[in-house]
Design a protein with these regions (language model features):
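Flexible coil/turn and secondary-structure edge motifs
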Residues: 1-144
Length: 144
C-alpha cells in the first residue's frame, strides 16, 4: 500500500522498491463491529514502537500503518488516544493512495500453510477468534 510506481509484486516490495508497505484490506459492517474494536485488535497485533519492522520482519515494507478511505478523523482521534501509551510511536496514519492485491499464493496464506510464520502471538489470535465468536453470537441474537 501507498508506494510509488505502477508495477508491484511481492519480490519488488521485499526489495523496498517503490516504498510499498505490506498491507491487508479490511472491509467491515459498522452494524456488526465498530471501528474502535478493529483498531483495538490491530494494536494487539502490532508493536507500535518498532520502526520499519515487526518482530523478526525487518524492512520498510513492514512499517505499520492504517491507510484509510473514510473515517480519517475517527482514526486519527483513536491514534492520538493511544500514542501516549508508548515511548516511541511509529504507526503511519494517512489516506490510502494505492493498494495492490498480492499474488494468489499469498491469499489465505495461513490457511494454505498452517505451520507458516506469523508474527502475531497465539494468545492474540485466540483473543481475536474469541472476540469474533462473541460478535457473531451477539449479532445472531435478534432483539424485538
Amino acid at each position: 500500500a501507498n508506494g510509488e510506481g505502477t508495477y508491484v509484486n511481492y519480490a519488488s516490495v521485499c526489495t523496498g522498491e517503490g516504498n510499498y508497505k505490506e498491507a491487508v484490506a479490511v472491509a467491515y459492517d459498522e452494524d456488526l463491529v465498530s471501528l474502535t474494536v478493529l483498531l483495538d485488535v490491530f494494536f494487539h497485533c502490532i508493536d507500535p514502537s518498532q520502526y520499519q519492522r515487526q518482530m523478526d520482519d525487518i524492512g520498510r515494507q513492514y512499517q505499520t500503518g492504517v491507510y484509510y478511505l473514510q473515517d480519517g478523523e475517527k482514526i486519527h482521534t483513536y491514534m492520538d488516544s493511544v500514542r501516549d501509551n508508548y515511548d516511541a510511536f511509529y504507526v503511519e496514519c494517512e489516506p490510502l493512495r494505492v493498494f495492490y492485491t498480492a499474488e494468489q499464493y499469498h491469499q489465505s496464506y495461513l490457511q494454505k500453510h498452517p505451520d507458516g510464520y506469523c508474527h502475531i502471538p497465539l494468545k492474540v489470535m485466540r483473543y481475536v477468534q474469541d472476540l469474533n465468536r462473541s460478535l457473531q453470537k451477539l449479532n445472531s441474537t435478534s432483539v424485538d
